[in-house]
């Protein structure tokens, strides 16, 4: 079973992304939600999702830190991490790619972009 993890400290953002990705559930994809970096790491370690949509600005452990831990410390390079953020400055993007994120999307994002990423990473067509 393929798995997606959505990580954001704002409940509305988590629910919006889950709604955008709802059609994947009908294709056997399990969607997990986390409200902070600590929860995200726990789910990543136990569930090994193929795809993570990860907010950057969160209390305690930032999205940058989560990405760095997943890619460098845990060596889970196969997990496709999309950093989602309102921070659109070039230096912010560079920092994201420095911690080995696979994609960097600024909010507000296009729904189709999120769906296309999930289709590509999971190899499942829903649109």
Model regions: which residues?
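Conserved sequence signature across two-component system core domains
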Residues: 7-8, 34, 52
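Two-component/phosphorelay signaling modules centered on CheY-like receiver
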Residues: 11-32
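Helix N-cap/capping motif at the beta->alpha junctions
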Residues: 33-42, 63
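Active-site beta3 strand of CheY-like receiver
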Residues: 47-53
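The feature encodes the CheY-like receiver
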Residues: 59, 68, 77, 89
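Alpha4 helix (beta4-alpha4-beta5 surface) of REC/receiver domains from two-component response regulators
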Residues: 65, 88-103, 112-119
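A Lys-centered signature of the CheY-like receiver
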Residues: 107
């Amino acid at each position: 079973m393929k798995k997606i993890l959505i990580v954001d400290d704002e409940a509305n953002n988590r629910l919006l992304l889950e709604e955008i990705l709802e059609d994947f559930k009908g294709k056997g994809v399990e969607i997990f939600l986390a409200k902070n970096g600590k929860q995200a790491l726990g789910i990543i370690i136990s569930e090994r999702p193929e795809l993570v949509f990860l907010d950057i600005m969160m209390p305690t452990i930032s999205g940058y830190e989560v990405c760095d831990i997943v890619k460098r410390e845990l060596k889970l390079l196969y997990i496709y991490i999309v950093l989602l953020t309102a921070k659109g400055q070039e230096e912010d993007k560079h920092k994201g790619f420095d911690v080995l994120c696979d994609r960097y999307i600024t909010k507000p994002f296009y729904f189709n972009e999120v769906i296309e990423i999930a289709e590509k990473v999971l190899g499942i067509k829903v649109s």
